[in-house]
Amino acid sequence: MGMGMMEVHLISGKGLQAHDPLNKPIDPYAEINFKGQERMSKVAKNAGPNPLWDEKFKFLAEYPGSGGDFHILFKVMDHDAIDGDDYIGDVKIDVKNLLAEGVRKGKSEMPPRMYHVLAHKIHFKGEIEVGVSFKLQGGGGCGGCYPWEN
């Protein structure tokens, strides 16, 4: 079993589609979840369908660990201060092989690529560009595994 730090790089979005009855530019952001650890990107104010986030998020990851679900879940939203935020769609990225390789080799990486944003698992709502890396922590501890330690 190995424990380490997984870094998720949320780079950009392309062609994001949200229903806005006033036809104003969307303000997209993403809620990111890995095994109960939640992070939120900044709101790309007036970015429209092609936001640039370029943000990195750190998650404590253990492999094989408990539970068999090794997915990063992205919930892409349109911020709306007046009517409440609107759901755009979801992305689910399987990182089981990334973590397994990282435990074997000490580190591993999934280079940035585009992932389809799907509403209700079937309706295409654009894409987000994401890269993921994992670094195994040595010595049985996990120094630096918590975002507030960096």
From Swiss-Prot:
SMART domains: C2. GO terms for molecular function: metal ion binding; RNA binding. The keyword Protease does not apply. Keywords: Calcium, Metal-binding, RNA-binding, Transport. Its cofactor is Ca(2+). Ca(2+) 2 binds at D20, D78, D80, D86. Pfam families: C2 (PF00168). The keyword Coiled coil does not apply. SUPFAM superfamilies: C2 domain (Calcium/lipid-binding domain, CaLB) (SSF49562). Residues 1-108 form the C2 domain. Ca(2+) 1 binds at D20, D27, D78, D80. Sieve elements of leaves, stems, roots and flowers. Binds to both sense and antisense RNA. Interacts with mesophyll plasmodesmata to mediate its own cell-to-cell transport and potentiate RNA trafficking. This is 16 kDa phloem protein 1.
